[in-house]
UniProtKB/Swiss-Prot annotation:
Active site: E74 (proton acceptor)
Protein name: Putative gamma-glutamylcyclotransferase MJ1514
Binding site for substrate: Y7, G8, S9, L10
Enzyme superclass (EC): transferase
InterPro entries from the UniProt entry: AIG2-like_dom (IPR009288), GGACT (IPR039126), GGCT-like (IPR013024), GGCT-like_sf (IPR036568)
Amino acid sequence: MEYVFVYGSLRKGFWNHEPYLKNSKFIGKGKTKEKYAMYVNIIPYVVENEKISHIVGEVYEVDEKTLKRIDCLEGHPDYYRRKKVSIILDSGKEIEAWLYFYPESCGILVESGDYKDYRG
């Protein structure tokens, strides 16, 4: 089993959650330990090399099959690239989870790091 940190359409209440994560174990809400930049250009994405805000999201425990399905959705490794990062859960616990990064910035910056704050 692996942990995956989701910050956009895979979060509960968004369009990709049910098809991809409805059977996965919810670990908790949290944010990245390090700062990154979130942009929206139709869909949200996070850029690793810009240090603007902690990214807000949810952590799920996923099996290999689910991780591969998410890789396919995200176009890993050709579109998004996943990398393990430290996540601080709202409970205070720190865990390592996969996060999908986009290689370049474009679109509208979400300064809060929370896709739910985007009003595009």
